[in-house]
């Protein structure tokens, strides 16, 4: 069933919406913002009570369709665990806006595949949102990545857990950009790729939260990650006692590699990349680092034009063009035993979970579910679709072209998202990142399936060689390459003389030279 979410504010006139699907109504007491949660009241199925709600995202805040973080609360304002729309009880939830994913299935598909591979992944329910009586389109109501028995099932840490076995876990970590709300540290091992936005691999401790994290706990988890990364890069990295197998849960890293490479996620490995560390067992075993859960796949499955994501015959782990990829992925792939484990697991999954039949069935079920609401969604956001002629032109083979490097045919961030239109500068966040465009929802589903078939064919051919003659391409550490940490401060004063490929910049480049505001590249959407 497709649920309908209704969001209204006290200061606004409420409109009655007639719908055959379930409604979730939220009444906010103040204007929503991304800094702090606003108190609101929500009715969602059997749940009715107070919540906290805030906007979420970075550059996606500029999108017409916003994303939201929800926290269920009791009357005193304390967070309370409650089931929503049939999903297990918890206090923390997310309304993901699939604005730059016309299929609206990429995040749910990624989460579903990860769960079917045997790991915890966020459960989702498709909903529609009405804000202050105005239709806001189709949303994904998702579990947030949090510690809990029905989420990431980690040992609950107390502030007194500062030594011995108690300090060993559990921890929830993320590799991403810097976030002042988290306790962060920087990897001592340089990442690989071009890394034009940053040269650093930044680890954040998500659980325990920064306000609860004790100095001894932070020191422990930082030292553990440092030791793990040093061991993987060391001369004894294959040794079962001194090498990487002593620190990581190898099976989870194998699955994470397969899952990420199938998706060719532009953010893969380097942004919204979660890990968790379990508490050591009494007998001294366990306590290893697990890869996952997976998160943030709106720029995956052929839906982006940078970080190798526009090249269906490329490896995702090599696509560190914006943020660097952690070097340990390249190093793990140098181990014949790790590659053999990948091949064995991949061939097993191809017979079931990763078969075209299984994946297509999930996509078709999802498309059937949202189909009755797509007309409303695209009426609200007509910019998501283009003419059949433009769609056809954009769907030509999209391997990275010689001479454009990471920019591919669409330019960095799709330079096709920038244009002069009637002579005025325009910013199109959809075209900015899109690897292709479509003229209808049905066409999007068809293109997505074709992309998946082609991607699986590439993986079939190359992973078959993993225990034979295949070796990863060794890339230099990103610190040895040219960096633009703050973007290109002056932009491209002269632009591309002939305009950018795929219809991006007009001849002569940006008016006034550079990006809007002179701030370099805009931030990327979708993180956290």
Which role does the model predict for each range below?
Residues 2-9:
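Hydrophobic h-region of N-terminal signal peptides that target proteins for export
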Residues 28-30, 55-57, 74, 97-99, ...:
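Short, flexible loop/turn elements at secondary-structure junctions
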Residues 59, 63-64, 183, 199-270, ...:
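Middle-to-C-terminal accessory/interaction subdomains
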Residues 12-45:
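N-terminal module-boundary/linker segments of secreted carbohydrate-active enzymes
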Residues 98-132:
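A conserved helix-loop-beta module that forms one wall/lid of the active-site cleft
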Residues 74-77, 90, 97, 118-120, ...:
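Internal "kinase-insert"/substrate-recognition segments embedded within catalytic cores
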């Amino acid at each position: 069933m497709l649920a309908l979410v209704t969001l209204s504010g006290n200061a606004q006139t409420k409109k009655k919406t007639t719908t055959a699907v379930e409604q979730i109504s939220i009444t906010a007491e103040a204007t929503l913002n991304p800094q702090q949660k606003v108190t609101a009241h929500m009715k969602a199925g059997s749940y009715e009570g107070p919540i906290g709600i805030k906007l979420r995202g970075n550059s996606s805040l500029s999108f017409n369709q916003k994303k939201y973080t929800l926290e269920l609360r009791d009357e005193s304002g304390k967070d309370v665990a409650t089931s929503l729309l049939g999903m297990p009880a918890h206090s923390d939830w997310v309304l993901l806006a699939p604005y730059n994913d016309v299929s609206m299935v990429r995040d749910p598909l990624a989460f579903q595949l990860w769960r079917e591979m045997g790991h915890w992944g966020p459960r989702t329910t498709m909903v529609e949102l009405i804000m202050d009586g105005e239709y806001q389109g189709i949303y994904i109501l998702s579990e947030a990545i949090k510690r809990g028995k029905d989420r990431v099932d980690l040992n609950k840490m107390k502030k007194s857990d500062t030594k011995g076995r108690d300090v060993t876990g559990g921890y929830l970590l993320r590799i991403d950009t810097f976030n002042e709300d988290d306790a962060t540290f920087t990897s001592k091992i340089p990442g690989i790729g071009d890394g034009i936005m940053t040269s650093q691999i930044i680890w954040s401790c998500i659980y325990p939260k920064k306000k609860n994290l004790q100095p001894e706990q932070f020191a422990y988890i930082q030292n553990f990650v440092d030791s793990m990364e040093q061991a993987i890069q060391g001369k004894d990295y294959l040794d079962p006692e001194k090498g990487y197998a002593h620190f990581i849960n190898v099976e989870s890293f194998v699955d994470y590699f397969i899952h990420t490479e199938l998706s060719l996620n532009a953010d893969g490995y380097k942004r919204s990349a979660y890990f968790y560390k379990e508490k050591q067992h009494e007998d001294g075993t366990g306590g290893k680092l697990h890869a996952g859960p997976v998160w943030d796949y709106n720029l995956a499955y052929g839906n982006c034009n940078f970080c190798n994501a526009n090249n269906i015959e490329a490896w995702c782990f090599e696509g560190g063009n914006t943020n660097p990829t952690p070097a340990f992925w390249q190093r793990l792939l140098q181990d014949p035993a790790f590659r053999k484990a990948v091949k064995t697991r991949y061939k097993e999954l191809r017979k079931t979970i990763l078969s075209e039949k299984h994946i297509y069935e999930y996509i078709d079920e999802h498309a059937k579910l949202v189909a009755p609401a797509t007309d409303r969604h695209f009426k609200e956001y007509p910019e998501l679709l283009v003419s059949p002629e433009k769609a056809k032109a954009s769907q030509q083979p999209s391997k990275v072209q010689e001479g454009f490097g990471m920019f591919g045919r669409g330019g960095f961030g799709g330079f096709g998202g920038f244009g002069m239109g009637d002579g005025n500068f325009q910013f199109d966040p959809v075209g900015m990142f899109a690897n292709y465009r479509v003229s209808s929802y049905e066409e999007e589903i068809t293109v997505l399936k074709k992309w998946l078939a082609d991607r699986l064919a590439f993986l079939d051919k190359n992973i078959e060689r993993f225990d034979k003659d295949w070796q990863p391409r060794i890339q230099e550490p990103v610190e040895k390459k040219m960096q633009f940490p703050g973007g290109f401060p002056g932009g491209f004063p002269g632009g591309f003389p002939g305009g950018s490929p795929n219809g991006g910049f007009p001849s002569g480049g940006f008016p006034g030279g550079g990006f809007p505001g002179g701030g370099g590249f805009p931030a990327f959407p979708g993180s956290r």
